[in-house]
């Protein structure tokens, strides 16, 4: 799978800033064990009980256009921050892709090497971490 592709335009003509394609994030030492259970629509508790893995995000697809303001709302523990941390590859994506606009080229951060990730983190993605 290529780490770059031509930037797609949003419906209103703007370029896309970030694209999440069927993103799945699982925490634990054997995340692949959870995937078939996720596909069978088992609950987060059932997956953790059977595999010891913790489901963070299941099958999320979302596109954010350049200049768009997007709010992710949900209950505590629903995966909002987990999904956002995938933008700069701080959380591992076990299935799916996260594409980030790097000056006109979409970079798949799930497949990017360390040098590319460093560039994306320094010049394309800004993140303010939540405080408790």
Which positions does each model-derived feature cover?
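ABC ATPase NBD coupling module
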Residues: 47-54, 106-126
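Short beta-strand immediately N-terminal to the Walker A/P-loop
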Residues: 70-71, 127
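The feature captures the beta-strand-to-loop junction immediately N-terminal to the Walker
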Residues: 73-75
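Conserved Walker
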Residues: 81-82
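Conserved ABC transporter NBD signature motif
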Residues: 96-108
């Amino acid at each position: 799978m290529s780490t770059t592709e031509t930037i797609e335009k949003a419906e209103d003509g703007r370029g896309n800033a970030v694209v999440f394609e069927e993103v799945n994030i699982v925490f634990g030492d054997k995340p692949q064990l959870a995937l078939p259970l996720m596909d069978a629509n088992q609950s987060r508790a059932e997956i953790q009980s059977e595999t010891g893995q913790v489901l963070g995000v299941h099958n999320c697809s979302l596109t954010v256009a350049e200049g768009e303001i997007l709010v992710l709302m949900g209950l505590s523990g629903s995966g909002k921050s987990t999904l956002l941390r995938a933008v700069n590859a701080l959380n591992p994506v076990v299935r799916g892709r996260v594409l980030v606009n790097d000056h006109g080229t979409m970079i798949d951060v799930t497949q990017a090497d360390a040098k590319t990730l460093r560039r994306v983190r320094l010049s394309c993605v800004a993140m303010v971490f939540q405080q408790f």
